[in-house]
């Protein structure tokens, strides 16, 4: 029997098009039917399509001559800003930040659609008038400090003004925030942790940090003689260092790090937050709960190149033992018990203190055992993830964008890239359409709540 053209008899399954909004109904008729024929109804066939074309609106602003002889012109609608409309700006931002279309190809695309726009005008749309977007992005990390228990972090290389730079990522299941800066260092990481304000504090915590980091005694005494104070901004604090006669670059860096650390410890922003990262030195901070990524750690073993079958077998055996131990740690996270905690700690010691007949593998075991506190942080803090895959996945988006457009050439361009990438990834995690988000913010409709508010709601729901 032939197909009837509809669903199978008795099927209750709804078609995929049942809930689509219909923009146009087009009745189809048959000509030349015999007399007495009557219409019984319709069988709908829905076709999805897309309209892409220039759409120009001419606002004819009425000019009035008032009785006193003066002229008054009707105002433009509130959403009109310049000679390019909301949907065009939305499309441009989406193409660049979501689909990673290069500026040159986007300009060509717009010209083929019939849009009269220059390279300079396209650049202006991408760079200017985004203060509200920047403010929303800058609120993501402080909000995460309030509502989260875990913060993933990682970094990747970047290019800015033709020079090497670094992009640092913070994120978890609620948000992602990207920050491109000039250097990869502990000082840079501390500055980012203090966002949105870079505040330098002279207090007991700062002095303790200088002592623990082995600052010269003369430097410690000079700082200890100063009154407690707080300085807002990098330039302000740099001027204070000049007034105090601290000219050595290494001493200035050490004091800046300690002053930022003093702010973090005083504000207690990260007391209930665990950091998860690879073992990069800039992420190592005293007083922080810091879990290390097992995937990164295991690479010290997986990247070995054994030259004999015996060495190859030793590597395979150890990798098998590591991942079986990893699975037991995952089970502990779900249902932690004291007896299991002690047993896992002992098992870790036996696993990474063993010796094989492969010297390079023995060296890898020593290095992994030295990371014991970070790799076993989950035993004291079961909420910590055992890997940093979330951060690596997020930051891969930045790497793809870097391949398309290379580096940034202006500070504003760098800021826009960080902002829109952060907002896009955060929208995705919160279940918000980035396309609709752009339209909502550009039009001023504000029907989508601020992303920090959605983060708080999502955290409360969990």
Where are these regions (language model features)?
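Short, flexible loop/hinge motifs at secondary-structure junctions
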Residues: 1-83, 153, 199-256, 263-265
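Mobile genetic element proteins and their domesticated derivatives, centered on retroelements
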Residues: 33, 66, 92, 106, ...
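Short helix/loop capping segments that flank catalytic or ligand/cofactor-binding pockets
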Residues: 41, 74-76, 160-162, 169, ...
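Short, positively charged, Gly/Tyr-enriched micro-motifs
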Residues: 51-149, 332, 424
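Acidic, metal-ligating active-site segments
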Residues: 90-94, 152, 160-229, 237-240
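Acidic/histidine-rich catalytic cores and adjacent linkers
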Residues: 230-251, 267, 273, 277-285, ...
């Amino acid at each position: 029997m032939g197909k009837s053209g509809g669903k199978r008899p008795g099927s209750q399954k709804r078609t995929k098009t049942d809930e689509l909004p219909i923009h146009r109904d087009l009745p189809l008729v048959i000509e030349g039917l015999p007399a007495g024929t009557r219409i019984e109804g319709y069988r709908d066939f829905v076709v999805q399509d897309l309209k892409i074309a220039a759409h120009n609106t001419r606002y004819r602003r009425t000019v009035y001559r008032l009785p006193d002889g003066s002229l008054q012109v009707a105002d433009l609608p509130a959403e009109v800003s310049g000679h390019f409309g909301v949907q065009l700006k939305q499309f441009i931002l989406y193409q660049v930040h979501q689909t990673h279309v290069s500026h040159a190809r986007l300009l060509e695309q717009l010209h083929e659609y019939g849009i009269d726009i220059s390279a300079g005008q396209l650049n202006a749309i991408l760079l200017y008038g985004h203060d509200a977007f920047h403010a929303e992005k800058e609120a993501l990390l402080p909000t995460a400090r309030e509502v989260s228990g875990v913060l993933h972090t990682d970094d990747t290389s970047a290019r800015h003004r033709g020079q090497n730079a670094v992009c640092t990522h913070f994120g978890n299941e609620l948000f992602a925030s990207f920050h491109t800066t000039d250097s990869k260092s502990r000082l840079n990481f501390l500055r980012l942790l203090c966002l949105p304000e870079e505040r330098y504090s002279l207090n007991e915590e700062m002095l303790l940090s200088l002592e623990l980091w082995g600052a010269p005694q003369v430097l410690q005494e000079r700082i200890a003689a100063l009154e407690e104070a707080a300085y807002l901004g990098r330039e302000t604090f740099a001027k204070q260092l000049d007034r105090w006669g601290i000219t050595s670059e290494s001493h200035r860096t050490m004091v800046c790090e300690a002053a930022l650390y003093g702010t973090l410890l005083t504000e207690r922003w990260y007391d209930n937050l665990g950091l998860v990262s690879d073992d990069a030195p800039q992420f190592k901070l005293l007083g922080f709960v810091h879990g290390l990524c097992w995937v990164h750690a295991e690479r010290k073993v997986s990247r070995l190149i054994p030259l004999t079958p015996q060495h190859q077998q030793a590597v395979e055996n150890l990798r098998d033992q590591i991942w079986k131990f990893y699975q037991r740690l995952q089970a502990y996270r779900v249902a932690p018990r004291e007896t299991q905690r002690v047993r896992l700690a002992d098992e870790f010691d036996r696993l990474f203190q063993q010796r094989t007949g492969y010297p390079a593998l023995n060296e890898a075991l020593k290095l992994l055992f030295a990371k014991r506190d970070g790799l076993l942080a989950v035993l004291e803090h079961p909420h910590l993830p055992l890997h940093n895959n979330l951060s690596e996945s997020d930051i891969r988006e930045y790497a793809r964008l870097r391949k398309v457009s290379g580096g940034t050439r202006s500070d504003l361009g760098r800021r826009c890239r960080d902002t829109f990438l952060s907002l896009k990834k955060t929208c995705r995690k919160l279940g918000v359409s980035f396309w609709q988000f752009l339209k909502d913010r550009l039009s001023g409709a504000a029907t989508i709540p601020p992303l920090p508010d959605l983060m708080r709601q999502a955290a409360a729901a969990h």
